[in-house]
Curated annotation (Swiss-Prot):
Protein name per the record: Chaperonin GroEL
Function: Together with its co-chaperonin GroES, plays an essential role in assisting protein folding. The GroEL-GroES system forms a nano-cage that allows encapsulation of the non-native substrate proteins and provides a physical environment optimized to promote and accelerate protein folding.
Similarity field: Belongs to the chaperonin (HSP60) family.
Keywords assigned: ATP-binding, Chaperone, Cytoplasm, Isomerase, Nucleotide-binding
GO biological process, one term: protein refolding
GO cellular component: cytoplasm
Subcellular compartments: Cytoplasm
GO molecular function, one term: isomerase activity
Gene symbol of the encoding locus: groEL
Source species of the chain: Lactobacillus delbrueckii subsp. bulgaricus (strain ATCC 11842 / DSM 20081 / BCRC 10696 / JCM 1002 / NBRC 13953 / NCIMB 11778 / NCTC 12712 / WDCM 00102 / Lb 14)
Reactions catalysed: ATP + H2O + a folded polypeptide = ADP + phosphate + an unfolded polypeptide
Length: 537
Protein backbone atom coordinates (compact mmCIF):
# COMPACT_ATOMS: atom_id res chain seq x y z
CA UNK A 1 0.00 0.00 0.00
CA UNK A 2 1.24 3.52 -0.88
CA UNK A 3 2.54 5.73 1.97
CA UNK A 4 2.26 9.44 2.64
CA UNK A 5 4.95 11.32 4.59
CA UNK A 6 4.73 14.52 6.63
CA UNK A 7 7.79 16.37 7.92
CA UNK A 8 8.78 18.60 10.89
CA UNK A 9 6.11 21.23 11.71
CA UNK A 10 3.32 19.54 9.71
CA UNK A 11 4.08 16.15 11.28
CA UNK A 12 4.20 17.51 14.83
CA UNK A 13 0.99 19.53 14.42
CA UNK A 14 -0.93 16.45 13.23
CA UNK A 15 0.46 14.36 16.10
CA UNK A 16 -0.49 17.08 18.61
CA UNK A 17 -4.06 17.20 17.25
CA UNK A 18 -4.34 13.44 17.85
CA UNK A 19 -2.85 13.78 21.36
CA UNK A 20 -5.38 16.50 22.22
CA UNK A 21 -8.42 14.65 20.85
CA UNK A 22 -7.65 11.56 22.93
CA UNK A 23 -6.50 13.40 26.06
CA UNK A 24 -9.49 15.79 26.05
CA UNK A 25 -11.82 12.77 26.01
CA UNK A 26 -9.99 10.86 28.74
CA UNK A 27 -9.23 13.72 31.15
CA UNK A 28 -12.91 14.50 31.77
CA UNK A 29 -12.98 11.30 33.89
CA UNK A 30 -10.24 12.38 36.34
CA UNK A 31 -11.06 12.73 40.03
CA UNK A 32 -14.15 12.08 42.17
CA UNK A 33 -16.21 14.61 40.16
CA UNK A 34 -14.98 13.20 36.84
CA UNK A 35 -17.60 12.37 34.22
CA UNK A 36 -18.26 9.07 32.49
CA UNK A 37 -17.66 8.31 28.81
CA UNK A 38 -20.05 6.17 26.75
CA UNK A 39 -18.32 3.79 24.31
CA UNK A 40 -20.22 2.35 21.36
CA UNK A 41 -19.66 -1.39 20.95
CA UNK A 42 -19.61 -3.24 17.63
CA UNK A 43 -22.26 -5.50 19.16
CA UNK A 44 -24.33 -5.44 22.33
CA UNK A 45 -25.09 -2.56 24.68
CA UNK A 46 -22.77 0.46 24.87
CA UNK A 47 -20.23 0.54 27.71
CA UNK A 48 -20.22 3.36 30.27
CA UNK A 49 -16.83 3.80 31.94
CA UNK A 50 -14.44 6.25 33.58
CA UNK A 51 -11.42 3.95 33.11
CA UNK A 52 -8.74 5.86 31.18
CA UNK A 53 -7.07 2.94 29.40
CA UNK A 54 -10.41 1.45 28.28
CA UNK A 55 -11.40 4.79 26.70
CA UNK A 56 -7.94 5.30 25.16
CA UNK A 57 -7.97 1.85 23.53
CA UNK A 58 -11.45 2.47 22.09
CA UNK A 59 -10.49 5.66 20.21
CA UNK A 60 -9.69 5.38 16.49
CA UNK A 61 -9.35 8.67 14.58
CA UNK A 62 -10.16 9.02 10.89
CA UNK A 63 -7.02 11.06 10.10
CA UNK A 64 -4.09 8.60 10.00
CA UNK A 65 -1.54 11.11 11.34
CA UNK A 66 -3.75 12.22 14.21
CA UNK A 67 -4.47 8.57 14.99
CA UNK A 68 -0.72 7.90 15.37
CA UNK A 69 -0.51 10.71 17.97
CA UNK A 70 -3.55 9.34 19.80
CA UNK A 71 -2.14 5.80 19.80
CA UNK A 72 1.16 6.99 21.31
CA UNK A 73 -0.70 8.59 24.23
CA UNK A 74 -2.78 5.42 24.59
CA UNK A 75 0.55 3.56 24.83
CA UNK A 76 1.56 5.71 27.84
CA UNK A 77 -1.78 4.89 29.50
CA UNK A 78 -1.54 1.20 28.62
CA UNK A 79 2.05 0.87 29.89
CA UNK A 80 1.08 2.52 33.19
CA UNK A 81 -1.84 0.11 33.45
CA UNK A 82 0.46 -2.89 32.77
CA UNK A 83 2.95 -1.84 35.47
CA UNK A 84 0.67 -0.45 38.18
CA UNK A 85 -2.87 -1.30 37.05
CA UNK A 86 -4.13 2.27 37.56
CA UNK A 87 -3.13 5.90 36.93
CA UNK A 88 -3.96 5.74 33.23
CA UNK A 89 -5.88 9.04 33.17
CA UNK A 90 -3.08 10.79 35.10
CA UNK A 91 -0.55 9.47 32.55
CA UNK A 92 -2.69 10.84 29.71
CA UNK A 93 -3.05 14.29 31.33
CA UNK A 94 0.71 14.50 32.02
CA UNK A 95 1.58 13.42 28.45
CA UNK A 96 -0.67 16.11 26.97
CA UNK A 97 0.74 18.80 29.28
CA UNK A 98 4.38 17.96 28.45
CA UNK A 99 3.74 17.62 24.70
CA UNK A 100 1.77 20.89 24.43
CA UNK A 101 4.43 22.94 26.23
CA UNK A 102 7.23 21.15 24.41
CA UNK A 103 5.69 21.76 20.96
CA UNK A 104 5.41 25.51 21.66
CA UNK A 105 9.14 25.66 22.45
CA UNK A 106 10.15 23.53 19.44
CA UNK A 107 8.12 25.82 17.14
CA UNK A 108 9.89 28.80 18.74
CA UNK A 109 13.25 27.29 17.70
CA UNK A 110 14.36 25.18 20.70
CA UNK A 111 16.29 21.96 20.06
CA UNK A 112 13.92 19.01 20.71
CA UNK A 113 16.81 16.68 21.67
CA UNK A 114 17.95 19.11 24.38
CA UNK A 115 14.38 19.48 25.63
CA UNK A 116 14.05 15.70 25.82
CA UNK A 117 17.25 15.46 27.90
CA UNK A 118 15.84 18.08 30.26
CA UNK A 119 12.55 16.16 30.54
CA UNK A 120 14.49 13.00 31.48
CA UNK A 121 16.53 14.85 34.16
CA UNK A 122 13.41 16.43 35.63
CA UNK A 123 11.55 13.12 35.70
CA UNK A 124 14.40 11.44 37.59
CA UNK A 125 14.43 14.27 40.16
CA UNK A 126 10.64 14.01 40.56
CA UNK A 127 10.70 10.22 41.01
CA UNK A 128 13.51 10.43 43.61
CA UNK A 129 11.50 12.99 45.60
CA UNK A 130 8.31 10.89 45.28
CA UNK A 131 10.08 7.95 46.92
CA UNK A 132 11.32 10.20 49.74
CA UNK A 133 7.75 11.41 50.36
CA UNK A 134 6.31 7.87 50.25
CA UNK A 135 4.64 6.15 53.26
CA UNK A 136 4.66 2.37 53.76
CA UNK A 137 1.39 0.41 53.75
CA UNK A 138 1.15 -1.62 56.94
CA UNK A 139 -2.40 -1.88 58.26
CA UNK A 140 -5.65 -3.37 56.95
CA UNK A 141 -7.27 0.11 57.18
CA UNK A 142 -4.62 1.60 54.88
CA UNK A 143 -5.17 -1.18 52.33
CA UNK A 144 -8.94 -0.52 52.49
CA UNK A 145 -8.35 3.23 52.01
CA UNK A 146 -6.23 2.75 48.86
CA UNK A 147 -8.80 0.36 47.35
CA UNK A 148 -11.72 2.64 48.30
CA UNK A 149 -10.12 5.66 46.60
CA UNK A 150 -9.41 3.78 43.37
CA UNK A 151 -12.87 2.21 43.14
CA UNK A 152 -14.79 5.19 44.60
CA UNK A 153 -16.53 2.66 46.86
CA UNK A 154 -15.95 1.88 50.55
CA UNK A 155 -17.68 -1.49 50.07
CA UNK A 156 -15.18 -2.56 47.36
CA UNK A 157 -12.28 -1.21 49.44
CA UNK A 158 -13.29 -3.30 52.45
CA UNK A 159 -13.74 -6.42 50.29
CA UNK A 160 -10.24 -6.11 48.79
CA UNK A 161 -8.71 -5.52 52.24
CA UNK A 162 -10.52 -8.61 53.53
CA UNK A 163 -9.31 -10.65 50.52
CA UNK A 164 -5.69 -9.64 51.17
CA UNK A 165 -6.08 -10.43 54.85
CA UNK A 166 -7.31 -13.95 54.04
CA UNK A 167 -4.82 -15.00 51.34
CA UNK A 168 -1.89 -12.72 52.18
CA UNK A 169 -0.53 -9.68 50.35
CA UNK A 170 1.11 -11.89 47.73
CA UNK A 171 -1.88 -14.24 47.50
CA UNK A 172 -3.99 -14.89 44.43
CA UNK A 173 -7.14 -12.75 44.11
CA UNK A 174 -9.42 -13.19 41.10
CA UNK A 175 -12.58 -11.41 39.96
CA UNK A 176 -15.71 -13.15 38.67
CA UNK A 177 -19.21 -12.05 37.67
CA UNK A 178 -21.80 -12.83 40.35
CA UNK A 179 -25.17 -14.37 39.59
CA UNK A 180 -26.88 -11.94 41.96
CA UNK A 181 -26.74 -8.18 42.51
CA UNK A 182 -24.49 -8.35 45.60
CA UNK A 183 -20.68 -8.12 45.46
CA UNK A 184 -19.23 -10.83 47.71
CA UNK A 185 -15.95 -12.52 48.64
CA UNK A 186 -15.21 -16.22 48.89
CA UNK A 187 -11.97 -18.15 49.42
CA UNK A 188 -11.57 -21.42 47.51
CA UNK A 189 -8.76 -23.91 47.01
CA UNK A 190 -6.61 -22.88 44.10
CA UNK A 191 -3.16 -22.08 42.79
CA UNK A 192 -1.33 -19.75 40.41
CA UNK A 193 1.92 -20.42 38.53
CA UNK A 194 4.05 -18.31 36.20
CA UNK A 195 3.34 -19.86 32.82
CA UNK A 196 0.99 -18.44 30.18
CA UNK A 197 -0.67 -19.74 27.02
CA UNK A 198 1.57 -21.04 24.22
CA UNK A 199 -0.48 -19.30 21.50
CA UNK A 200 -2.42 -16.03 21.68
CA UNK A 201 -5.04 -17.63 19.41
CA UNK A 202 -6.17 -19.62 22.45
CA UNK A 203 -7.61 -16.56 24.25
CA UNK A 204 -11.35 -16.32 24.88
CA UNK A 205 -11.40 -12.60 25.82
CA UNK A 206 -9.63 -10.46 23.20
CA UNK A 207 -9.96 -7.24 25.23
CA UNK A 208 -8.03 -8.60 28.21
CA UNK A 209 -6.04 -11.17 26.19
CA UNK A 210 -7.10 -13.89 28.65
CA UNK A 211 -8.42 -17.41 28.27
CA UNK A 212 -11.16 -18.46 30.69
CA UNK A 213 -12.02 -22.16 30.93
CA UNK A 214 -15.17 -23.13 32.84
CA UNK A 215 -15.19 -26.60 34.42
CA UNK A 216 -12.24 -27.88 32.32
CA UNK A 217 -10.42 -31.20 32.27
CA UNK A 218 -6.69 -30.76 33.01
CA UNK A 219 -4.02 -32.95 31.39
CA UNK A 220 -0.83 -32.90 33.49
CA UNK A 221 2.33 -34.39 31.97
CA UNK A 222 6.11 -33.94 32.07
CA UNK A 223 6.37 -35.05 28.42
CA UNK A 224 6.64 -33.04 25.22
CA UNK A 225 3.56 -33.30 23.00
CA UNK A 226 4.56 -33.08 19.34
CA UNK A 227 2.28 -35.69 17.74
CA UNK A 228 -1.46 -35.02 18.01
CA UNK A 229 -2.14 -38.76 17.60
CA UNK A 230 -0.75 -39.31 21.12
CA UNK A 231 -3.69 -37.46 22.69
CA UNK A 232 -6.35 -37.94 19.97
CA UNK A 233 -8.41 -40.67 21.73
CA UNK A 234 -8.62 -38.52 24.86
CA UNK A 235 -9.53 -35.39 22.84
CA UNK A 236 -12.37 -37.23 21.11
CA UNK A 237 -13.88 -38.22 24.47
CA UNK A 238 -13.62 -34.62 25.74
CA UNK A 239 -15.29 -33.26 22.56
CA UNK A 240 -18.17 -35.72 22.99
CA UNK A 241 -18.73 -34.38 26.52
CA UNK A 242 -18.57 -30.75 25.32
CA UNK A 243 -15.95 -29.87 27.96
CA UNK A 244 -12.89 -27.62 27.68
CA UNK A 245 -9.27 -28.75 28.24
CA UNK A 246 -6.15 -27.28 29.84
CA UNK A 247 -2.90 -29.00 28.81
CA UNK A 248 0.07 -28.58 31.19
CA UNK A 249 3.07 -30.19 29.48
CA UNK A 250 6.84 -29.89 29.14
CA UNK A 251 6.06 -28.30 25.75
CA UNK A 252 3.59 -28.56 22.87
CA UNK A 253 5.42 -28.45 19.54
CA UNK A 254 5.41 -29.83 15.99
CA UNK A 255 2.01 -30.39 14.39
CA UNK A 256 0.27 -30.71 17.79
CA UNK A 257 0.14 -26.97 18.59
CA UNK A 258 -1.26 -25.73 15.22
CA UNK A 259 -3.79 -28.60 15.23
CA UNK A 260 -5.04 -27.59 18.69
CA UNK A 261 -5.18 -23.90 17.69
CA UNK A 262 -7.08 -24.69 14.47
CA UNK A 263 -9.68 -26.71 16.36
CA UNK A 264 -10.02 -23.91 18.92
CA UNK A 265 -10.57 -21.28 16.18
CA UNK A 266 -13.10 -23.50 14.38
CA UNK A 267 -14.99 -23.95 17.64
CA UNK A 268 -14.55 -27.73 17.73
CA UNK A 269 -13.52 -27.48 21.38
CA UNK A 270 -11.99 -24.99 23.81
CA UNK A 271 -8.36 -25.84 24.60
CA UNK A 272 -5.41 -23.97 26.10
CA UNK A 273 -1.84 -25.31 26.35
CA UNK A 274 0.76 -24.03 28.83
CA UNK A 275 4.29 -25.10 29.70
CA UNK A 276 4.78 -26.86 33.02
CA UNK A 277 6.15 -24.59 35.78
CA UNK A 278 9.65 -24.97 37.23
CA UNK A 279 12.67 -26.95 35.98
CA UNK A 280 14.15 -30.41 36.54
CA UNK A 281 13.10 -32.20 39.72
CA UNK A 282 11.26 -29.11 40.96
CA UNK A 283 9.05 -29.29 37.85
CA UNK A 284 8.03 -32.87 38.71
CA UNK A 285 7.19 -31.83 42.27
CA UNK A 286 5.12 -28.84 41.12
CA UNK A 287 3.22 -31.01 38.64
CA UNK A 288 2.46 -33.43 41.49
CA UNK A 289 1.15 -30.46 43.54
CA UNK A 290 -1.17 -29.47 40.67
CA UNK A 291 -2.31 -33.09 40.32
CA UNK A 292 -3.18 -33.26 44.04
CA UNK A 293 -5.08 -29.97 43.84
CA UNK A 294 -7.11 -30.98 40.76
CA UNK A 295 -7.56 -34.70 41.46
CA UNK A 296 -5.50 -35.76 38.44
CA UNK A 297 -2.49 -37.97 37.78
CA UNK A 298 0.85 -36.82 36.33
CA UNK A 299 1.28 -38.70 33.04
CA UNK A 300 4.96 -39.57 33.31
CA UNK A 301 7.26 -42.39 32.20
CA UNK A 302 8.53 -42.46 35.80
CA UNK A 303 5.10 -43.85 36.71
CA UNK A 304 4.97 -46.10 33.62
CA UNK A 305 2.20 -44.00 32.00
CA UNK A 306 1.94 -43.19 28.27
CA UNK A 307 0.04 -40.26 26.75
CA UNK A 308 -1.78 -42.44 24.21
CA UNK A 309 -3.27 -44.57 27.02
CA UNK A 310 -4.54 -41.60 29.06
CA UNK A 311 -8.04 -42.07 30.49
CA UNK A 312 -10.41 -39.25 31.45
CA UNK A 313 -10.26 -40.52 35.04
CA UNK A 314 -6.53 -39.58 35.09
CA UNK A 315 -7.24 -35.94 34.18
CA UNK A 316 -7.59 -33.24 36.80
CA UNK A 317 -10.61 -30.94 36.99
CA UNK A 318 -11.37 -27.45 38.34
CA UNK A 319 -14.33 -25.09 38.50
CA UNK A 320 -12.46 -22.43 36.52
CA UNK A 321 -9.01 -21.74 35.08
CA UNK A 322 -7.82 -18.30 33.90
CA UNK A 323 -4.74 -18.09 31.66
CA UNK A 324 -2.95 -14.85 30.69
CA UNK A 325 0.24 -14.46 28.64
CA UNK A 326 2.27 -14.74 31.88
CA UNK A 327 0.30 -16.84 34.37
CA UNK A 328 -2.22 -19.64 34.94
CA UNK A 329 -4.70 -19.52 37.84
CA UNK A 330 -6.56 -22.69 38.84
CA UNK A 331 -9.64 -21.99 40.97
CA UNK A 332 -11.46 -24.60 43.05
CA UNK A 333 -9.68 -27.79 41.96
CA UNK A 334 -11.43 -31.15 42.37
CA UNK A 335 -8.65 -32.79 44.40
CA UNK A 336 -9.48 -34.77 47.54
CA UNK A 337 -8.74 -32.87 50.75
CA UNK A 338 -6.76 -35.87 52.06
CA UNK A 339 -4.46 -35.88 48.98
CA UNK A 340 -3.82 -32.13 49.31
CA UNK A 341 -3.12 -32.47 53.04
CA UNK A 342 -0.70 -35.32 52.33
CA UNK A 343 1.27 -33.07 49.92
CA UNK A 344 1.24 -30.26 52.49
CA UNK A 345 2.58 -32.56 55.23
CA UNK A 346 5.31 -33.86 52.89
CA UNK A 347 6.44 -30.32 52.00
CA UNK A 348 6.48 -29.25 55.66
CA UNK A 349 8.68 -32.24 56.49
CA UNK A 350 11.05 -31.33 53.62
CA UNK A 351 11.27 -27.73 54.92
CA UNK A 352 12.30 -29.03 58.35
CA UNK A 353 14.90 -31.41 56.88
CA UNK A 354 16.59 -29.11 54.33
CA UNK A 355 19.65 -27.04 55.22
CA UNK A 356 19.68 -25.02 51.97
CA UNK A 357 18.10 -21.55 52.21
CA UNK A 358 17.31 -21.63 48.48
CA UNK A 359 15.54 -25.00 48.73
CA UNK A 360 13.67 -23.84 51.81
CA UNK A 361 12.45 -20.72 49.97
CA UNK A 362 11.21 -22.78 47.00
CA UNK A 363 9.47 -25.27 49.30
CA UNK A 364 7.79 -22.43 51.19
CA UNK A 365 6.53 -21.01 47.88
CA UNK A 366 4.99 -24.41 47.02
CA UNK A 367 3.45 -24.66 50.48
CA UNK A 368 1.91 -21.18 50.17
CA UNK A 369 0.38 -22.09 46.80
CA UNK A 370 -1.17 -25.27 48.17
CA UNK A 371 -2.48 -23.83 51.44
CA UNK A 372 -3.13 -20.15 50.66
CA UNK A 373 -6.08 -20.74 48.36
CA UNK A 374 -7.55 -18.20 45.96
CA UNK A 375 -9.76 -15.29 47.01
CA UNK A 376 -12.60 -14.76 44.53
CA UNK A 377 -14.46 -11.43 44.44
CA UNK A 378 -17.90 -12.04 42.91
CA UNK A 379 -18.98 -8.72 41.35
CA UNK A 380 -22.75 -8.22 41.29
CA UNK A 381 -24.97 -5.57 39.67
CA UNK A 382 -28.55 -5.05 38.50
CA UNK A 383 -27.75 -4.68 34.77
CA UNK A 384 -25.03 -5.90 32.42
CA UNK A 385 -23.86 -2.32 31.73
CA UNK A 386 -23.52 -1.61 35.47
CA UNK A 387 -21.76 -4.95 35.96
CA UNK A 388 -19.09 -4.10 33.34
CA UNK A 389 -18.49 -0.67 34.88
CA UNK A 390 -18.31 -2.12 38.41
CA UNK A 391 -15.93 -4.85 37.34
CA UNK A 392 -13.57 -2.25 35.79
CA UNK A 393 -13.55 -0.41 39.14
CA UNK A 394 -12.83 -3.55 41.15
CA UNK A 395 -9.95 -4.48 38.80
CA UNK A 396 -8.51 -0.94 39.08
CA UNK A 397 -8.79 -1.01 42.86
CA UNK A 398 -7.13 -4.42 43.17
CA UNK A 399 -4.21 -3.35 40.95
CA UNK A 400 -3.80 -0.05 42.80
CA UNK A 401 -3.78 -1.83 46.16
CA UNK A 402 -1.09 -4.29 45.05
CA UNK A 403 0.97 -1.32 43.83
CA UNK A 404 0.62 0.42 47.22
CA UNK A 405 1.77 -2.70 49.05
CA UNK A 406 4.86 -2.84 46.77
CA UNK A 407 6.09 0.78 46.91
CA UNK A 408 3.98 2.54 49.55
CA UNK A 409 1.62 5.48 49.06
CA UNK A 410 1.65 9.28 48.73
CA UNK A 411 -0.94 12.04 49.16
CA UNK A 412 -3.68 11.56 46.55
CA UNK A 413 -5.61 13.88 44.27
CA UNK A 414 -2.49 14.93 42.34
CA UNK A 415 -1.06 16.53 45.52
CA UNK A 416 2.06 14.32 45.46
CA UNK A 417 3.05 15.68 42.03
CA UNK A 418 2.68 19.32 43.20
CA UNK A 419 4.86 18.40 46.21
CA UNK A 420 7.80 17.36 43.98
CA UNK A 421 7.62 20.56 41.89
CA UNK A 422 10.29 22.32 44.01
CA UNK A 423 12.73 19.39 43.64
CA UNK A 424 12.31 19.59 39.85
CA UNK A 425 12.76 23.39 39.79
CA UNK A 426 15.99 22.96 41.79
CA UNK A 427 17.41 20.71 39.02
CA UNK A 428 19.83 22.52 36.70
CA UNK A 429 20.23 21.75 33.00
CA UNK A 430 23.59 21.87 31.18
CA UNK A 431 22.12 23.94 28.32
CA UNK A 432 19.25 26.40 27.84
CA UNK A 433 17.25 23.74 25.98
CA UNK A 434 17.72 21.23 28.81
CA UNK A 435 16.55 23.89 31.29
CA UNK A 436 13.50 24.45 29.10
CA UNK A 437 12.73 20.69 29.30
CA UNK A 438 13.05 20.80 33.12
CA UNK A 439 10.70 23.81 33.32
CA UNK A 440 8.17 22.03 31.07
CA UNK A 441 7.99 19.07 33.48
CA UNK A 442 7.74 21.41 36.51
CA UNK A 443 4.67 23.07 34.92
CA UNK A 444 3.17 19.74 33.82
CA UNK A 445 3.29 18.36 37.39
CA UNK A 446 0.37 20.63 38.32
CA UNK A 447 -1.82 19.49 35.39
CA UNK A 448 -3.58 16.58 37.21
CA UNK A 449 -4.62 18.83 40.16
CA UNK A 450 -5.83 21.51 37.75
CA UNK A 451 -7.91 18.95 35.87
CA UNK A 452 -9.40 17.42 39.06
CA UNK A 453 -10.38 20.95 40.21
CA UNK A 454 -11.86 21.91 36.83
CA UNK A 455 -13.87 18.66 36.68
CA UNK A 456 -15.29 19.70 40.09
CA UNK A 457 -16.21 23.16 38.74
CA UNK A 458 -13.32 25.08 40.36
CA UNK A 459 -10.53 27.21 38.92
CA UNK A 460 -7.47 24.93 38.60
CA UNK A 461 -4.78 27.63 38.94
CA UNK A 462 -6.34 28.98 42.19
CA UNK A 463 -6.25 25.48 43.73
CA UNK A 464 -2.61 24.93 42.67
CA UNK A 465 -1.53 28.32 44.11
CA UNK A 466 -3.19 27.45 47.43
CA UNK A 467 -1.47 24.03 47.61
CA UNK A 468 1.96 25.62 47.11
CA UNK A 469 1.46 27.70 50.28
CA UNK A 470 0.23 25.00 52.68
CA UNK A 471 1.59 21.83 54.33
CA UNK A 472 2.73 19.21 51.74
CA UNK A 473 0.14 16.69 52.94
CA UNK A 474 -2.75 19.13 52.49
CA UNK A 475 -4.60 18.69 49.21
CA UNK A 476 -7.86 19.55 47.48
CA UNK A 477 -10.69 17.12 48.28
CA UNK A 478 -12.81 17.55 45.14
CA UNK A 479 -15.55 15.25 46.44
CA UNK A 480 -16.34 17.66 49.31
CA UNK A 481 -14.87 20.84 47.75
CA UNK A 482 -12.45 21.61 50.60
CA UNK A 483 -8.76 21.48 51.55
CA UNK A 484 -7.86 18.63 53.90
CA UNK A 485 -4.87 16.62 55.12
CA UNK A 486 -4.98 13.93 52.41
CA UNK A 487 -3.12 11.28 54.46
CA UNK A 488 -5.36 11.72 57.52
CA UNK A 489 -8.49 11.62 55.35
CA UNK A 490 -7.28 8.47 53.58
CA UNK A 491 -7.12 10.17 50.15
CA UNK A 492 -3.97 8.43 49.00
CA UNK A 493 -2.42 7.10 45.78
CA UNK A 494 0.05 4.22 45.43
CA UNK A 495 3.56 5.61 44.82
CA UNK A 496 4.02 3.08 42.00
CA UNK A 497 0.96 4.43 40.16
CA UNK A 498 2.08 8.07 40.37
CA UNK A 499 5.68 7.17 39.47
CA UNK A 500 4.68 5.01 36.48
CA UNK A 501 2.26 7.64 35.17
CA UNK A 502 4.98 10.32 35.21
CA UNK A 503 7.74 8.12 33.76
CA UNK A 504 5.59 6.79 30.91
CA UNK A 505 4.18 10.23 30.11
CA UNK A 506 7.70 11.71 29.97
CA UNK A 507 8.94 8.84 27.78
CA UNK A 508 6.14 9.13 25.19
CA UNK A 509 6.23 12.95 25.25
CA UNK A 510 10.00 12.89 24.61
CA UNK A 511 9.49 10.62 21.60
CA UNK A 512 6.73 12.84 20.19
CA UNK A 513 8.82 16.01 20.55
CA UNK A 514 11.83 14.49 18.77
CA UNK A 515 9.72 13.19 15.85
CA UNK A 516 10.79 14.80 12.56
CA UNK A 517 8.75 12.72 10.09
CA UNK A 518 5.59 10.61 10.17
CA UNK A 519 4.84 7.89 7.62
CA UNK A 520 1.19 6.85 7.23
CA UNK A 521 -0.73 4.72 4.79
CA UNK A 522 -2.79 6.44 2.10
CA UNK A 523 -6.31 5.02 2.46
CA UNK A 524 -7.56 3.23 -0.63
CA UNK A 525 -10.78 4.39 -2.23
CA UNK A 526 -12.69 1.14 -2.44
CA UNK A 527 -15.50 1.08 -5.02
CA UNK A 528 -18.93 0.47 -3.58
CA UNK A 529 -20.19 -3.08 -3.93
CA UNK A 530 -22.54 -3.62 -6.89
CA UNK A 531 -26.19 -4.22 -5.96
CA UNK A 532 -27.24 -7.86 -5.88
CA UNK A 533 -28.73 -9.18 -9.12
CA UNK A 534 -32.22 -10.73 -9.10
CA UNK A 535 -32.11 -14.41 -8.23
CA UNK A 536 -28.72 -14.16 -6.45
CA UNK A 537 -28.37 -15.47 -2.89
Amino acid sequence: MAKDIKFSEDARRSLLNGVNKLANTVKTTLGPKGRNVVLEQSYGAPTITNDGVTIAKAIELEDHYENIGAKLVAEAASKTNDIAGDGTTTATVLTQAIVQEGMKNVVAGANPVGIRRGIEKATKAAVDQLHKNSHKVSSRDQIAQVASISSASKEIGDLIAEAMEKVGKDGVITIEDSRGIETELSVVEGMQFDRGYLSQYMVTDNDKMEADLENPYILITDKKISNIQDILPMLQEIVQQGRSLLIIADDVTGEALPTLVLNKIRGTFNVVAVKAPGFGDRRKEQLADIAALTGGTVISEDLGLELKDTQLSQLGQARRVTITKDSTTIVDGSGAKEAIQERVDTIRKQIEDTSSDFDKKKLQERLAKLTGGVAVIHVGAATETELKERRYRVEDALNATRAAVDEGYVAGGGTALVNVEEAVKATKGDTDDEQTGINIVARALTAPVRQIAENAGQEGSVVVDHLRKVDPEVGYNAAEDKYVNMIDEGIIDPTQVTRSALQNAASIAGLLLTTEAVVAEIPEDKPEAAPAQPGMM
